[in-house]
Amino acid sequence: MIEFHDVHKTYRVAGREIPALQPTRLNIQAGQIFGLIGHSGAGKSTLLRLINRLEEPSGGRILVEGEDVTALDAEGLRRFRQRVGMIFQHFNLLSSKTVADNIAMPLRLAGGFSRAEVDARVSELLARVGLSDHARKYPAQLSGGQKQRVGIARALACRPSILLCDEATSALDPQTTASVLQLLAEINRELKLTIVLITHEMDVIRRVCDQVAVMDGGAIVEQGDVADVFLHPQHPTTRRFVFEAERVDEDERHDDFAHVPGLILRLTFRGEATYAPLLGTVARQTGVDYSILSGRIDRIKDTPYGQLTLALVGGDLEAAMSQLNAADVHVEVLR
C-alpha cells in the first residue's frame, strides 16, 4: 500500500512560494493500477515523483508498504528505489547502449549479480516485452512503441513491487498506446505489481485502471472506482475529461434535444444490465413510447457499460421512472 498523510509540496521561486501540491491524503492498495489524471500543471507529476522521492515533500508523511519513505537516509532511499521501477514519457534510453545493455543497467548499478545472472534476467525481460530479437539493436533503430517496451523491461529489471508510469503513452500513436497499455495490464496481472500512472487522457484510465484520482490546481478533486467516476462524474474537471473522451460537447448535446418532446433521460447501464431488454419491458408494462436520441456500448477495463439518451412520452411516466430506478440503472433527468 502507498499512503500519503497530509503530503504537500511548495517550490520557492524568486523569493515566492508556489504551491505544487496541496495537503493530500491518499491510499493506493497493493496490486492495483491507480491512475492520476489532470491537465498540465495540475500536480500529478509532482505527486507521482514524491512516491520515490525524486521530489522532496515540503511536509507530511509518505508510507510505502509500511515504511516511512520520508524518514529514509541516503542509503535507505537507494535500497528503497530498487523496489520502485519507473518509466518515462520520452523513454530516457542511453543512445550509445544496446537494448540489452539498457535493460541490464539497473542490475549493474545495484551490484551483486554475476554476468550470467544479468544475461539471464535480460533475456527473460526481453521475452516478456516481446523484443527477444532486438537485444543487439540500438534505440535509434527502434520505433516509439519498442523504445517504451525497453523502458518497461528496464524498470522491471530489479524485480520491483511498484511501477511508476510518467505519461508513458502520451508520445505514442493510438495503436501503439493500446499495445503498451495491454502490456502494462499483463504485467500487473501476472507479476502482481502495483502500478501508478499519470495521464491527461481519460481513455487511458478507462482501459486499464482500477482506481482514479482527478487532479486540478494541485489538489485531488475527485477519486474512486474508475467505473463510478467515469459514469457518474461529479466535479466539473472530471466531467470535462469524460466528455472529451466521448468527443461530445455537453452544452451542444442538450441543445440538440431542445425540439424533442417528452421527458428526456440519460440511462447508464453497467455489467450484465448493459445487455438486458429493459426498455421494451418498461414500455410494455407502463404504456410509454420512447425515442432513442443517442447511445453507446463500451467497456471500462473488463466491465461492459452502456449509455442511452432517450425521450419518453405518453403512458405512465412515473411508473416508467420507478421501474428504471429499480432495475439498477442510473437515471439522470436532462429535461
From Swiss-Prot:
Q: Which UniProt keywords apply?
A: Amino-acid transport, ATP-binding, Cell inner membrane, Cell membrane, Membrane, Nucleotide-binding, Translocase, Transport
Q: Kindly give the membrane topology term recorded for this protein.
A: Peripheral membrane protein
Which CDD domains does the annotation name?
ABC_MetN_methionine_transporter
Quote the EC number: 7.4.2.11
Reaction catalysed by this enzyme:
L-methionine(out) + ATP + H2O = L-methionine(in) + ADP + phosphate + H(+); D-methionine(out) + ATP + H2O = D-methionine(in) + ADP + phosphate + H(+)
**CC annotations in GO:** plasma membrane
Stated family: Belongs to the ABC transporter superfamily. Methionine importer (TC 3.A.1.24) family.
Q: What is said about its interaction partners and assembly?
A: The complex is composed of two ATP-binding proteins (MetN), two transmembrane proteins (MetI) and a solute-binding protein (MetQ).
Its name, as the record gives it, is Methionine import ATP-binding protein MetN 2
